């Protein structure tokens, strides 16, 4: 069944052809418009081979963690703010992190210290008997395993993450400095 309405692509080609006829005085414009007209006409329904595929999962795996968090280029995006703004952003985030770290640290220290206190109390009253010879034997075994595993070579995963962190710190010195200053203030408050 044929309809009398023309296809949308043919309307674009006809409109482009009319506009290119109006600009016959400028040969550069005519040639570029003609090329666009030809490209539009030739690509109607033919999209094979014209596109390049990009595997986003592989692309995301290759990106450093701060680019995933802050965007493609964290350096220039941070540099677009003034020095005071960068220091303020770093200081506020550092203070919040330090404050939370302090509160969680106090809670963890209280739990560990309280648990140690209760264990000592239970040991002193006789509820728990510690086999100190076995503890000493296990400690020696653990020391030997650490000596065996100890090497001067850092694993590549750790080295690559450390290089990423150093690169981020170098690109964002003001934000990083503000963060550490704010972190220390947050720990103190």
UniProtKB/Swiss-Prot annotation:
Annotated GO molecular function terms are: phosphatidylinositol-3,4,5-trisphosphate binding
Work out whether the entry's keyword set contains Membrane: yes
Cytoplasmic-side stretches of the chain, per the record, are: 1-80, 129-164
Query: Cellular component per GO?
Result: mitochondrial outer membrane; mitochondrion; nucleus
> Which domain of life does the protein's organism represent?
Eukaryota
Subcellular location(s) of the protein: Mitochondrion outer membrane; Nucleus
TM ranges are 81-101, 108-128, 165-185
The record's section on InterPro entries has: FUN14
Q: How does it sit in the membrane?
A: Multi-pass membrane protein
Keyword field:
Membrane, Mitochondrion, Mitochondrion outer membrane, Nucleus, Phosphoprotein, Transcription, Transcription regulation, Transmembrane, Transmembrane helix
Pfam family for this entry, one: FUN14
Q: Which residues carry this modification: Phosphoserine?
A: 10, 53, 151
Mention one GO biological process in which this protein takes part, according to its record.
intracellular triglyceride homeostasis
Where expressed (tissue)? Answer: Highly expressed in platelets (at protein level).
Mitochondrial intermembrane face residues: 102-107, 186-189
PANTHER family per the UniProt record, alphabetical:
FUN14 DOMAIN CONTAINING, FUN14 DOMAIN-CONTAINING PROTEIN 2
Q: What is this protein's function per UniProt?
A: Binds directly and specifically 1,2-Diacyl-sn-glycero-3-phospho-(1'-myo-inositol-3',4',5'-bisphosphate) (PIP3) leading to the recruitment of PIP3 to mitochondria and may play a role in the regulation of the platelet activation via AKT/GSK3B/cGMP signaling pathways. May act as transcription factor that regulates SREBP1 (isoform SREBP-1C) expression in order to modulate triglyceride (TG) homeostasis in hepatocytes.
Which family does the similarity line name?
Belongs to the FUN14 family.
Protein name, as recorded: FUN14 domain-containing protein 2
User: Which organism encodes this protein?
Assistant: Homo sapiens (Human)
Give the lineage: Eukaryota, Metazoa, Chordata, Craniata, Vertebrata
